[in-house]
């Protein structure tokens, strides 16, 4: 036992004693899940428990069954959003959108059974056999850079994609009208990357429409396979028509010669669309433009029948795709017209195409630029035109990465006995929708709980209504206990991109409650629409916080421990803490129930503070009275010092069963395995100086006069520890874990690299303390300016060099690392440029 730990256990601080009653009888004690009414399912299950015990059945088995049932039961609190909130009747402006972030370009409706559209392309004749077909964003497909130049999150976007010798520009604009979400139009332009090239390639563009149910598509095909239009009808869209207009040269109106192939079949399943098209590109055709030599190309067979129609194809949906093959440069427009929009006026609306489409696109682009400057004021703050372009791309990439998902996740229930969860079979969560931004279109095209709070800090500055929509959907995922899964893998398309072993979410695992960061901003701004939303959201926010506070409780009052560290993996240098979001950040070398995690305690303190202030503002006296004492106890300096200040290290730290004497050594045939030397592990503070050490500062939990603030600023500003020319590194360069692999196949992740989300928190904290009177005010302000220059400057240089925002950045040379594009929390660079914290 570490020096001083015996004293702490025997004589807890008065603040800890005072808080124990609130902490252990605190939020949600009345019904175990945040004060909300019990669900009907919960009541029935409880009755079964009582009856089973009366009949002599095993109480432990029944309790496990009861907990398993609650894990996949939706919470009973009133929903924040109505059930039809995504319908065209309630939100027509959001019904259609680029809600398929994993494809290079596509749109769909916000519906459990959506109508989907998309684009594929291939350059003919560059490689033997089937040409490289581009459709879904992939990390290693060689495409790039790519990303949205403009995207307003609602009705307009312009994206540029570089693919070898090709440069594609995809644009869309929506036009409101009618009762079904209005009209929209695309323009896809393909030009040579090198304007001076003489050998212009032959390119095939594939425009497709997919239905996901019994909806009907009726194509009208003209001579030589040219699709004139597609008419259709669905219950949500009414009557509609798609039209693929004849191709032209960019900026011209004269039609350009193209070769056409059309294919119509049953929907094979959304994850299989790419492979189906690849497999059908097996017939040779001749492209014969007038006055030019013919060229061969691989095309789709001209099937116009609905294949597999019958018992096996009923209700499967349809897949209709038009291939257009021609020489670049080209521009093609694809138009969707809603029947109700056309019928809504006294005269038919002109088609949103040609010069009318050009005018609409330019008008929206100019409106975006003006709104962007008015919102973020980068030009006024003196940032260069290039940095302003970076800011626009950061915002647009985040908004263009918003997706709509629907499906059932797999949940492994918490049966209440730690370590036994693997003995329980996973169960399906109820079908739920999710409207969310994603971290990365190529690598993480789905919802992540702790990422989303950072995403919405950016989104809400631009469009608060989008943030309300996203938060409402996330809170709709709450189960009966108040748990939200940290990774949402909903629907076939999302599931197809995740290895099977990672599909299951464990109901005992938490995640940092970052959704409270945009909630705190809403409360600070005080917009009436936000406050009305928060009034509806409070019961679910309360339930979610109560679950976190209770389920992750640590060994001592006011201490907390991330569940989910696996001690039984001999190949890991340090067992991961995935629920914390910091994955391989070094914790106690030997996981145990004695651990106390500093970052988690700080997150709980932030949650208690935000929800107390929210309850007070809304006049919810009962919630405020319940959470207020807990918030005060968690923010008390004595309590934080008692549990997490490590005098021998001079910083705040985790506590647990730990030794530094661990290393990976080769042990054939196992490969690298962990070897523990001397000294043997003992209960002590964990000497891993890094992001975790800063959390009391990052979340602004310290008083500006605190004696602990100075030492934290010291390590933050020390280049031997966390300071680098490119931002704060995640783990001190002086740490024995710095830059170390966690296993043979697991390179360092949170062990030195610079991450934008934590650097943004650090900038906000330094800005905060730099504006509060205290002994460290001037130093905090100076460090803020220097850190901001380092972070913004490096992201800008890497964007110039690569065209991408990256997941993380090297603390050694600043280069982008990890996956790209990463317009998730790296988009926080925009708020750093705007000095908006």
Swiss-Prot record:
Reaction equations catalysed: N(4)-(alpha-D-Glc-(1->2)-alpha-D-Glc-(1->3)-alpha-D-Glc-(1->3)-alpha-D-Man-(1->2)-alpha-D-Man-(1->2)-alpha-D-Man-(1->3)-[alpha-D-Man-(1->2)-alpha-D-Man-(1->3)-[alpha-D-Man-(1->2)-alpha-D-Man-(1->6)]-alpha-D-Man-(1->6)]-beta-D-Man-(1->4)-beta-D-GlcNAc-(1->4)-beta-D-GlcNAc)-L-asparaginyl-[protein] + H2O = N(4)-(alpha-D-Glc-(1->3)-alpha-D-Glc-(1->3)-alpha-D-Man-(1->2)-alpha-D-Man-(1->2)-alpha-D-Man-(1->3)-[alpha-D-Man-(1->2)-alpha-D-Man-(1->3)-[alpha-D-Man-(1->2)-alpha-D-Man-(1->6)]-alpha-D-Man-(1->6)]-beta-D-Man-(1->4)-beta-D-GlcNAc-(1->4)-beta-D-GlcNAc)-L-asparaginyl-[protein] + beta-D-glucose
Compositionally biased region (Basic and acidic residues): 17-33
Cytoplasmic compartment residues: 1-38
One of the record's GO molecular function terms: glucosidase activity
EC number from the UniProt entry: 3.2.1.106
Motif (Endoplasmic reticulum targeting): 3-9
Main location (coarse class): endoplasmic reticulum
Protein known as: Mannosyl-oligosaccharide glucosidase
Outcome following mutation: residue 652 to L: In CDGIIb; loss of activity
Biological source species: Homo sapiens
Transmembrane stretches, start-end: 39-59
Any one Pfam family match given in the protein's UniProt record, by short name: Glyco_hydro_63
Any Gene Ontology CC annotation: membrane
Sequence ranges on the Lumenal membrane side: 60-837
Disease: Type IIb congenital disorder of glycosylation: Characterized by marked generalized hypotonia and hypomotility of the neonate, dysmorphic features, including a prominent occiput, short palpebral fissures, retrognathia, high arched palate, generalized edema, and hypoplastic genitalia. Symptoms of the infant included hepatomegaly, hypoventilation, feeding problems and seizures. The clinical course was progressive and the infant did not survive more than a few months.
Activity regulation as described: Inhibited by 1-deoxynojirimycin (40% inhibition) and N,N-dimethyl-deoxynojirimycin (85% inhibition).
Family: Belongs to the glycosyl hydrolase 63 family.
Compartment(s) where it occurs, according to its Swiss-Prot or TrEMBL record: Endoplasmic reticulum membrane
Biochemical pathway: Glycan metabolism; N-glycan degradation
Membrane topology: Single-pass type II membrane protein
GO biological process entries: oligosaccharide metabolic process; protein folding; protein N-linked glycosylation; viral protein processing
Its biological purpose: In the context of N-glycan degradation, cleaves the distal alpha 1,2-linked glucose residue from the Glc(3)Man(9)GlcNAc(2) oligosaccharide precursor in a highly specific manner.
Keywords: Disease variant, Endoplasmic reticulum, Glycoprotein, Glycosidase, Hydrolase, Membrane, Signal-anchor, Transmembrane, Transmembrane helix
InterPro entries noted in UniProt: 6-hairpin_glycosidase_sf, 6hp_glycosidase-like_sf, Glyco_hydro_63_C, Glyco_hydro_63N, Glyco_hydro_63N_sf, Glycoside_hydrolase_63
């Amino acid at each position: 036992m570490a020096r001083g730990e015996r004293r702490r256990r025997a004589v807890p601080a008065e603040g800890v004693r005072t808080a124990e009653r609130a902490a252990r009888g605190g939020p949600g004690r009345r019904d175990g899940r945040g004060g909300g009414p019990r669900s009907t399912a919960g009541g029935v299950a409880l009755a079964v428990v009582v009856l089973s015990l009366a009949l002599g059945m095993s109480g432990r088995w029944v309790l496990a069954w009861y907990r398993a049932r609650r894990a996949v039961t939706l919470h009973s609190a009133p929903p924040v959003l109505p059930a039809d909130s995504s319908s065209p009747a309630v939100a027509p402006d959001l019904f259609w959108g680029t809600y398929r972030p994993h494809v290079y370009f596509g749109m769909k409706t916000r519906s459990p059974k959506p109508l989907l559209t998309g684009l594929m392309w291939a350059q003919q004749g560059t490689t033997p056999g089937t040409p490289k077909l581009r459709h879904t964003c992939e990390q290693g497909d060689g495409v790039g850079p790519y990303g949205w130049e403009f995207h307003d999150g609602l009705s307009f976007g312009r994206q540029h994609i570089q693919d070898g010798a090709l440069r594609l520009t995809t644009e869309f604009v929506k036009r409101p009208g009618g009762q079904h979400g209005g009209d929209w139009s695309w323009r896809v332009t393909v030009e040579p990357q090198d304007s001076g090239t003489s050998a212009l390639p032959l390119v095939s563009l594939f425009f497709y429409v997919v239905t996901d149910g019994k909806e009907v598509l009726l194509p009208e095909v003209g001579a030589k396979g040219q699709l004139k239009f597609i008419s259709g009808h669905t219950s949500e869209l009414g009557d509609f028509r798609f039209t693929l207009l004849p191709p032209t040269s960019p900026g011209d109106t004269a039609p350009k010669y193209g070769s056409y192939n059309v294919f119509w079949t049953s929907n094979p399943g959304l994850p299989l669309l790419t492979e189906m098209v690849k497999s059908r590109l097996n017939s040779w055709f001749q492209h014969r433009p007038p006055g030019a030599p013919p060229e061969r190309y691989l095309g789709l067979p001209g099937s116009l029948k609905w294949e597999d129609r019958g018992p096996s194809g009923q209700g499967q949906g349809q897949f209709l795709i038009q291939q257009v093959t021609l020489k670049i440069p080209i521009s093609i427009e694809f138009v969707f017209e809603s029947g109700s929009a056309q019928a809504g006026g006294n005269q038919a609306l002109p088609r949103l195409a040609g010069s009318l489409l050009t005018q609409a696109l330019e008008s929206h682009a100019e409106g975006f630029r003006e709104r962007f400057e008015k919102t973020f004021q980068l030009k006024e703050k003196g940032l260069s035109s290039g940095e302003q372009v970076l800011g626009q791309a950061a915002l647009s990439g985040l908004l263009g990465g918003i997706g709509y998902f629907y499906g059932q996740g797999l949940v492994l229930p918490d049966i209440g006995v730690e370590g036994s969860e693997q003995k329980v079979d996973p169960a399906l969560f109820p079908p739920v929708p999710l409207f969310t931004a994603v971290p990365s279109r190529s690598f993480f095209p789905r919802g992540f709980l702790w990422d989303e709070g950072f995403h919405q800090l950016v989104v809400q500055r631009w469009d608060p209504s989008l943030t309300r929509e996203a938060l409402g959907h996330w809170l709709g995922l709450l189960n009966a206990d108040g748990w939200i899964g940290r990774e949402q893998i909903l629907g076939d398309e999302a599931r197809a991109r995740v290895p099977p072993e990672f599909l299951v979410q464990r109901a005992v695992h938490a995640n940092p409650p970052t959704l409270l960061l945009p909630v705190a901003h809403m409360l600070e701004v005080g917009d009436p629409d936000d406050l009305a939303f928060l009034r509806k959201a409070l019961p679910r926010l309360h339930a979610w916080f109560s679950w976190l506070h209770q389920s992750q409780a640590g060994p001592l009052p006011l201490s907390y421990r991330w569940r989910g560290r696996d001690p039984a993996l001999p190949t890991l240098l340090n067992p991961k803490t995935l629920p914390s979001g910091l994955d391989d950040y070094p914790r106690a070398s030997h996981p145990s129930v004695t651990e106390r995690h500093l970052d988690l305690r700080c997150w709980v303190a932030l949650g208690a503070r935000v929800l107390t202030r929210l309850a007070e503002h809304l006049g919810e006296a009962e919630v405020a009275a319940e959470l207020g004492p807990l918030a005060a106890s968690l923010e008390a300096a004595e309590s934080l010092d008692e549990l997490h200040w490590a005098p021998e290290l001079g910083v705040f730290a985790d506590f647990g069963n730990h030794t530094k004497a661990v290393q990976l050594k080769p042990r054939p045939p196992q490969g690298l395995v962990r070897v523990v030397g001397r000294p043997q592990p003992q209960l002590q503070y964990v000497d891993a100086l890094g992001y975790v050490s800063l959390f009391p500062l990052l979340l602004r939990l310290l008083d500006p006069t605190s004696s602990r603030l100075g030492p934290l600023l010291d390590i933050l500003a020390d280049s031997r520890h966390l300071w680098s020319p490119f931002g704060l590194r995640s783990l001190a360069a002086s740490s024995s874990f710095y830059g170390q692999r966690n296993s043979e196949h697991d390179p360092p992740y949170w062990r030195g690299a610079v991450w934008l989300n934590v650097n943004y928190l650090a900038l906000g904290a330094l800005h905060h303390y730099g504006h509060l009177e205290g002994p460290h005010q001037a130093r905090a302000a100076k460090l803020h300016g220097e850190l901001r220059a380092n972070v913004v400057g490096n992201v800008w240089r890497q964007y110039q060099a690569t065209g991408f925002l990256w997941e993380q950045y090297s603390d050694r040379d600043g280069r982008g690392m990890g996956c790209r594009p990463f317009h998730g929390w790296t988009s926080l660079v925009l708020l750093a440029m705007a000095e908006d914290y």
